[in-house]
Swiss-Prot record:
CDD domains: ABC_6TM_MRP1_2_3_6_D1_like, ABC_6TM_MRP1_2_3_6_D2_like, ABCC_MRP_domain1, ABCC_MRP_domain2. It comes from Caenorhabditis elegans. Residues 305-587, 959-1245 form the ABC transmembrane type-1 domain. Induction: Up-regulated in response to environmental toxicants such as methylmercury. Expressed in head neurons, including the dopamine (DA) motor neuron, and other cells in the body. ATP binds at residues 659-666, 1316-1323. The keyword Glycoprotein applies. Residues 46-66, 116-118, 187-346, 456-535, 583-953, 1027-1068, 1112-1184 are cytoplasmic. The gene is mrp-7. This is Multidrug resistance protein mrp-7. It is found in: Cell membrane. Residues 900-925 are annotated as: Disordered. InterPro entries: AAA+_ATPase (IPR003593), ABC1_TM_dom (IPR011527), ABC1_TM_sf (IPR036640), ABC_transporter-like_ATP-bd (IPR003439), ABC_transporter-like_CS (IPR017871), ABC_transporter_C-like (IPR050173), MRP (IPR005292), P-loop_NTPase (IPR027417). It is a multi-pass membrane protein.
Amino acid sequence: MLSSFCGDGHPFSTGLPNVSICAQHTVLVWVPAAFFLLTLPFLSAQCHLTAQRFARLPFSAHFIIKLLLVAFLAANSLATWCYVLFSKNSYAAAYYVYPGLWVLVWTGTFLVHLIRLRCGLVSSGIQHVTSLIFLLCGAPEFYQWIRMENSNSFPNDLTTTDSAQFLSIAYLSWYSALILYTFSLCFADPRGAKTDDEKASSKSAASPELQSSFLNRLTLWWFNSIPWTGARRDLEIDDIFELNERSGTEFLSELWESFWEPKRLKYIHDTSIWAKKDPSEQEKDPVVIPSVVSSLFMMFRWEFLLASTLKFVSDTMQFASPFLLHELLNFISAKNAPFWKGMALSILMFSVSELRSLILNGYFYIMFRMGTKIQTSLTAAVYKKTLLISNSARRDRTVGEIVNLMAIDVERFQMITPQIQQFWSCPYQITFALVYLFITLGYSALPGVVIMVIFVPMNIISSMIVRKWQIEQMKLKDERTKMVNEVLNGIKVVKLYAWEVPMEAYIDEIRTKELALIKKSAMVRNILDSFNTASPFLVALFSFGTFVLSNPSHLLTPQIAFVSLALFNQLRSPMTMIALLINQAVQAVVSNKRLKEFLVAEELDEKCVDRSVNIERSHNAVRVENLTASWDPEEAAGEKTLQDVDLTAPRNSLIAVVGKVGSGKSSLLQALLGEMGKLRGRIGVNGRVAYVPQQPWIQNMTLRDNITFGRPFDRKRYDQVLYACALKADIKILPAGDQTEIGEKGINLSGGQKARVSLARAVYQNLDVYLLDDPLSAVDAHVGRHIFEKVIGPNGLLREKTRILVTHGLTYTKMADEILVMLEGKIEESGTFEHLIKRRGLFFDFMEEYKSGSDNSSEAGGSQDDDFEAIGGEIQDYMNPEDVVLTVTNDLDETIRTPELTTQISTMSSPEKPPTGTSPAAATESQNKLIKKEGIAQGKVEIATYQLYVKAAGYLLSIAFIGFFIVYMTLQILRSFWLSAWSDEYDPDSPSAHPMAKGWRLGVYGALGFSETACFFVALLALVFVGQRASKNLHGPLIHNLMRSPMSFYDTTPLGRILNRCAKDIETIDMMLPMNFRYLVMCVLQVAFTLIVIIISTPLFAVVILPLALIYLIFLRYYVPTSRQLKRLESVHRSPIYSHFGETIQGAASIRAFGKVDEFRQDSGRILDTFIRCRYSSLVSNRWLAVRLEFVGNCIIFFAALFAVLSKEFGWITSPGVIGVSVSYALNITEVLNFAVRQVSEIEANIVSVERVNEYTNTPNEAPWRIEGREPAPGWPSRGVVKFDGYSTRYREGLDLVLHDISADVAAGEKIGIVGRTGAGKSSFALALFRMIEAAGGRIVIDDVEVSQIGLHDLRSNITIIPQDPVLFSGTLRFNLDPFFTYSDDQIWRALELAHLKHFAAGLPDGLLYKISEAGENLSVGQRQLVALARALLRHTRVLVLDEATAAVDVATDALIQETIREEFKECTVFTIAHRLNTIMDYDRIMVLDKGSILEFDTPDALMADKNSAFAKMVADAAEQDKHE
């Protein structure tokens, strides 16, 4: 039938390398036509999706040319069809059908182009592939017509020469036009030109990806400009292409919410119904939390399906290589095989490999792009949820857990995405390979398959064991990082107490355990890797052994040996991958669980606070009725933070809220913000709300931006706010004025300055209702009075606003319109100041305590109630450890202006401080930042960095590692050539045919394989010791040097940057670098030995090595610097994501209160998009390289096969076995070439961690801890006589003096009060005593010992300080009191008793072994301060410094501390730095400092007697503040 249709008796026969005319006119026409028709729906969908995003394309010359070519192809097909239809000659049926199909296809193509123009689709892969298929299928007929024209012989079914000539000219012109058309599709149709506004909207270039043609995208040609730029200079962020709209945070966030939000709302609805059911029914019908994975699949289902299709095609095509290898070996073995067949096989091997490479790279490109989109979607979702989550849900999660959701769990989703298709791909590859093996070896393949199957559970079990150890190791790493974090947080206290040694020992102890687990995991992995690497050999050994021994007729020919070996090698990858997939899947399931639980967690109830404008609109701004609220409504039955609260705040009124610590004052403000769970009652707030938290929230931006907070800049309003908040003097000393970037959490501002910036932000917003949580507690008397008068009070800027002020400063309450007195979550009393005084109730008692409690100065200490503090404090301390860097320096002297601040600014910017009053515009950009941004490393990594790592690892171990790998590769090649000789011994024509006993062949093959495996294992064993030694020798000195670094280092270096060295960089050194070096050495050796094998097999191959190597090096020249810089950009732009996230968590309440949630989400989106731009470009650069290097690898395959064919054709003696070895090695080189370059790039990126760690290992150190021969006598100081003799000091060489010519003699046991206005030098005085800053002149002598002549530890361990902000560490209560374990339990209990903590400690479950949480968050502020007092009592040195140690506690606790100090330290010399003047009025002498000099130094009585003395004026200021009547 087909013969009749074609008019040919032999429809598919061919004697030459031709395709029959029948096939040309049937199959080769039907296939492309069918492809075109079947893909039309997909093309239609592509046009529809594109039309939603882009405008219509303009008519361009390029488009018109394509349209004309398609029109010609259609017209030519129509002419051919008409000629055949209306010709007088008779033709076979096929001649009538195929032109008609052409007309249909090309007419359809013409219409598709017009539709594509309208839809804005610049290029279509479907059209390009269709034209390529037409081109390939038409090639045989094109060749046929040319051959017939040359020979002037035509087929029998063409009856006349004229008809033959017409059809010949028609087809040749048609095919020529098809070539031109296919070439034109290599270029995309241009879009319309951008407008000037669009060009100016971004500094970075728009990505050309979406404007590129299909071939351009397939080869990633559009990315060329990035490597081109990267090879010429270091890349900058502006060089990186912008993300496409659908890869950006804004689009993906909306897409995520469209799929996730309905599921979340349904879950909440179902949960509310479920909660009402009986417990028995609840167990039977639990509510299932919606899966994150299902939502992600729905978002990216079409991309996923496209990638699946590509993966399926790629996996199928990989089995073409063994088939073609089999045919090539058959060709080599056959004596009379035609030369063209060998050439065709060579071309086919190259074409199939190159096509598979392009398809596989397309698959990875899609999946990696999907991974970045998933990362963007989930990161944005976690960020948004953080701003909406309720406090009760938030309390169940530490900050670390929330950060890990973004840093680890989201990252896992991104990393597993490219591998997710392997779950179906691996079984498919295994099945296909097994079928092929059974065809090749029969049942002899079974032993090999059984071995590979055994490896699967072995891999799984080993992975589970390693995973268990990895979890333990991660816990130890977290514990070590947390401890380093805490030590660096409290580094000033650590140094003041001389605790560096026990802290370093504690960290080293954790590190030793961590390294032990890393070693155990590595050993198991190495055993597993050795088995996996040996698996092809073991499988081949048993399979070949079974094959040749089971039947004497079974001959191990090259075709069987090397095709089977190729299949075994292809089996190894999916078999090994299964265990990794299971491991990754388990991690992904855990991450999915953690993410979905967080994303469905309870959110703040927006309806909790009624913000309707109609609430008491005529008069009241705030109305609270019968409010009962709790931080955890689900556990409200046990504890209610607020109970039965009624509150009315008229418009423009000032309401003062007072009460003891923990009475619920801060909780009341939180309830008004909607932050607490409302159990019953009603809250109404009329107007926009501003919130000033007790712990100031400062962003990492300029001072001005912190104050304007997104509002337009209004100079007049701004200046008013600066003056009212007493910030003008501060701005004058900043290097760039208010344009100075003040660092994370305002690291270089004092507590008082941060409080005033926080207040200024709220005032500048000009809102309606102000909730002020004790904003005056951090400032001293005259500043507090100024702020109250100019901002809060009846005549302040907020006089026309409603103000609810929480305060411990009872002197401010007189001017309040109403006072609320809180006790245990209830409003006990309310009324005006006069009314409450007359009632002589709770408020009157407070006033009495206030008057008699030694604090009538500028502020009364206060803190949040414990419930709120548990949340706020955790965020503050965990996320931004830098906050405590200047605790002593700043909090000793916190207000308008401090020389210490000026000095630190100078330290961080330039040696020359700008003159006071310098215009911000005149300041250089470098002066704007107090903390400099971390620089991006540029250029190549120095060879010295590699030498440093090798030196740390040990030279002998490094040489052993490389040496055993060389032996391993040598044995592998010997084994391959032994197999070659074995397979050739049955070929009588082979020059290497030397028959041997099968047992001997098998034995030697096995011996070589086992020796090879042993060498591989020993090499890996050496690598384990290399990594362990390097890790130990790099981490230990780093920690030691950090302990030895002076405070100036910590003043100018954000702790986050230091922590990055101790955490991320050390992890890279531990885990990544050993693996990088392993794979690099393996790849380099494998490439080198492969080339050697091919040259030995076919010496002619040496001719092409040089050009191929040149091409390879050119690609390296462009890729390596580009990849290196992209990795660095990615690393640098990753940090802002977490910094901004940390700021957001810390300031979530403020962000919600000010209504800035959407703005912060947009800011987070911009930061995230910048990072994703870098990561996406880095991933694309890998694919860009892979496309090009795999082309080089495929060229090696082609030349290896080609020279084998030429060797046979020209009589160069080459056996099939040797050719089998050569081509087998060549088939494996493609991925190795790419992987080798990737490893070079990875090592360059990761070795930077060694450089960064070494940088902080060699920073300048402070003075020695101990000086041999200069140790003070035991018991020193025994008297406590302190002498300052002309003492001067500065913070660093070259900076201004902060203390000038201080001379003072302090007798033993004397009590000295140190006071002064802000900037007087009080904090510098305390730091100088402990040598935290060194003398620039003069000396300090304690008991006849000059302190500069002894070691720092000898000094600091023998004098004591009680800081204002007590620092506690994770560990037991005992460890926090006595880390050296110097004192007995009885002594510690005695100290706790004297510190009024014994009753508390005795009631703890574990007593002295009670676990203190991070930063001591499970103790109240007052309890932490008492622990600091207990430390001082334990040490009981003769010299004691009190750094305003009672500022953060209430009056009662203050009285306890003062009483204990007076009693227990009555024989000691005491220096008290005080803002509260009443605490020092009974001291022996008062030292008044001013501008770094002693202004006055006399007894309190003498100074008070002189009414013109500075001290007398300070007391008068405080007294003025205390007037109540």
